[in-house]
């Protein structure tokens, strides 16, 4: 907790609404961009329906933009809240795929040796290296992994690695639940390393079922039964795992233009909640220029006519091969 990372609404002596904004980094288009993650959004029950949370979010958007954040992300506490946050410009951008396997035989022996004695600095570096194939992902530093390890251990699980000569070949964050083993996050430097750590985990925990979360677009989950005898895929489901909101469209589109210098687009963007985002953007030869809507008129021919949610879908879902991935946010 830090006071400068909280926004609150106080009425008299009552705390009416609050949110906590935490700094993270998002890998995007080959670079890294600042992202604020929101947690603990809440309104005192007797004060709901009075617009306090909406006013609080709008204030926080402006504050975080001034602090240099381009994006704000959150994980709705329940599905019904996706529509609510959508009213404030959030769009579902993060997806994962959940796999359920049944273990119906004896798994083959593996040479993989599980280890949980490493320090978090080494772990965060190895995790970032192993997830570099994910073109858009939320990154975690040493402090994050300190918290993750403490949290999963309190739940009876742990963070496990396999390695060769001091270099991690796989990392898995797991929590046992009944006769199931939940793998909250897993990454490896190849299919066989993935198979090795899963086999070793199953030998350690002896589950009857395996629940595995992977980035949407990863093919490993589908082919895992063909690589590891003794397990059978029972279900596979794509799930929304988070929303994001653009708070600095001008800088973000500049980053996009720099990453794709051969692309040319003209975009009309309207953002009623954050008018500073509105404008006509011209992306050409690695640069992005902006014209205010008031000066460009409504007759300007554009390739795209977006509100902020449509721009988010275009940038994060249509222009990225693998859906953006956000994991280990302590939301499960």
Feature-to-residue mapping (PLM):
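Conserved GNAT acetyl-CoA-binding A-motif
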Residues: 57, 64-77, 205-216
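Active-site/acyl-donor-binding loops of N-acyltransferases
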Residues: 88-107, 188, 199-332
């Amino acid at each position: 907790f830090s006071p400068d990372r909280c926004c609150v609404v106080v009425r008299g002596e009552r705390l009416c609404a609050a949110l906590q904004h935490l700094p993270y980094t998002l890998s995007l288009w080959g670079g890294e961009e600042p992202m604020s993650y929101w947690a603990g959004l809440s309104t005192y029950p007797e004060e709901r329906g009075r617009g306090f949370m909406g006013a609080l979010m709008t204030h926080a958007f402006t504050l975080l933009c001034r602090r240099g954040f381009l994006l704000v992300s959150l994980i709705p506490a329940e599905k019904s809240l996706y529509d609510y946050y959508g009213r404030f410009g959030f769009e579902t951008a993060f997806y994962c795929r959940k796999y359920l396997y049944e273990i119906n035989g004896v798994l083959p022996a593996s040479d993989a040796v599980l280890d949980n004695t490493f320090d978090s600095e080494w772990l965060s570096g190895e995790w970032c290296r192993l997830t570099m194939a994910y073109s858009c992902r939320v990154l975690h530093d040493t402090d994050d992994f300190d918290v993750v390890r403490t949290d999963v251990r309190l739940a009876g699980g742990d963070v496990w690695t396999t390695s060769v000569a001091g270099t991690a070949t796989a990392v898995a964050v797991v929590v046992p639940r009944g006769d199931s083993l939940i793998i909250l996050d897993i990454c490896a430097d190849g299919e066989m390393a993935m198979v090795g750590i899963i086999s070793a985990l199953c030998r350690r925990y002896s589950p009857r079922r395996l629940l595995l979360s992977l980035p949407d677009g990863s093919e490993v989950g589908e082919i895992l039964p063909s690589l590891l005898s003794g397990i059978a895929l029972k279900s596979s489901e794509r799930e929304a795992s988070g929303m994001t909101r653009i708070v600095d469209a001008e800088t973000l589109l500049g980053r996009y233009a720099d990453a794709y210098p051969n692309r040319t687009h003209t975009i009309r963007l309207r953002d009623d909640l954050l008018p500073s985002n509105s404008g006509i953007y011209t992306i050409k030869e690695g640069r992005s220029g902006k014209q205010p809507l008031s000066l460009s008129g409504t007759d300007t021919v554009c390739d795209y006519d977006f509100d902020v949610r449509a721009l988010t879908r275009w940038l994060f879902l249509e222009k990225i091969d693998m859906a953006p991935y956000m994991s280990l946010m302590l939301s499960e």
